Amino acid sequence: MGEIVLRLDRVMADRKMSLKELSEKVGVSNVNLSKIKTGKISAIRFSTLEAICEALDCQPGDILEYVK
């Protein structure tokens, strides 16, 4: 069975955006964004994903990847 992997670090690097800057734009704490970035979460709210995509000007598929 595969798994969904978060690639937030890659998208942030492409956009040259720091965790602090993204945190301020999204309205999520640095700690929670860090957990998202490192994949130490089991779920993410659509509203949070939407806010991240808005801040990074990307699509959910740019952040989420299905790996077999």
Q: Which stretches of residues belong to each language-model region?
A:
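DNA major-groove recognition helix of helix-turn-helix
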Residues: 37, 67
